[in-house]
Amino acid sequence: MDKLIIGRYIVGDSFIHRLDPRSKLLAMLIYIIVIFWANNPVTYAVITLFTLFLVFLSKIKLGFFLGGIKPMIWIILFSTLFQVFFNTRGNVLWSIGFFKITEVGLNQGWMIFLRFILIISFSTLLTLTTTPLSLSDAVESLLKPLTIFKVPAHEIGLMLSLSLRFVPTLMDDTTRIMNAQKARGVDFDEGNIIQKVRSIIPILIPLFASSFKRADALAIAMEARGYRGSEGRTKYRRLLWNCRDTLSIIAILALGLILFYLKS
């Protein structure tokens, strides 16, 4: 649990670190759209190389990105196997009972697997190179035009910032509670599935109690400092869009055009 990557920021001075957080969020949105354009091995090879190049530019060890994938591995495998065994379209390559592996199912399976890996890797890159406060400011800035439609841009940004900030804290609390339970003789690895699920209850109850206490303390602290929402607030740190941010957006749009060409 203490190795969960999401919500953690690694201090650095790489090209990716210096990008405006708004350009990173826009790039991620375009990146996700581009990934769903890819539909053959060549397009996925191109986007994988592009992602590895971004990892290289970030100057962050590859192990951190593998750490971002690890908590999601069971969901990735389940989604992949579901496509492989339950997609009945196309020529049947192998079958046993209700399970069939078809050409289309196998093709969809490996594409879904890579989509998960690539999207999680880019999301991990975003959180590792951008502070939660910067992400919050970026979301608020991008949503500000929607305030004319009564969209609470500041509140959405604040919720994102608090969520990212408290994920590592909750994981640390979970690790601490599990270690305390193990010291009392609890073995989380023994027994059948039902017994393992039951063993989680002694973790959830104190974790919820700790979460409510932290939320209450945070609310009191914000009120004590005179927090009243976005009205009349100014910012000490201002976001600055420059040439490298424009080039980054152009680069990922160029990637999309390349994939669109290779796809057709």
From Swiss-Prot:
InterPro entries: ABC/ECF_trnsptr_transmembrane (IPR003339), EcfT (IPR024919). One of its GO terms (cellular component) is plasma membrane. Disulfide bonds: none annotated. GO terms for molecular function: riboflavin transmembrane transporter activity. The chain crosses the membrane at residues 27-47, 62-82, 109-129, 240-260. It comes from the Bacteria. It holds the Pfam family CbiQ. It is found in: Cell membrane. Keywords: Cell membrane, Membrane, Transmembrane, Transmembrane helix, Transport. It is a multi-pass membrane protein. The keyword Heme does not apply. Its main location: membrane. One of its GO terms (biological process) is riboflavin transport. PANTHER family: PROTEIN ABCI12, CHLOROPLASTIC. Forms a stable energy-coupling factor (ECF) transporter complex composed of 2 membrane-embedded substrate-binding proteins (S component), 2 ATP-binding proteins (A component) and 2 transmembrane proteins (T component) upon coexpression of the components in E.coli. May be able to interact with more than 1 S component at a time. Transmembrane (T) component of an energy-coupling factor (ECF) ABC-transporter complex. Unlike classic ABC transporters this ECF transporter provides the energy necessary to transport a number of different substrates. Expression of the complex plus RibU in de-energized E.coli allows riboflavin uptake. Belongs to the energy-coupling factor EcfT family. This is Energy-coupling factor transporter transmembrane protein EcfT. It comes from Streptococcus thermophilus (strain ATCC BAA-250 / LMG 18311). The gene is ecfT.
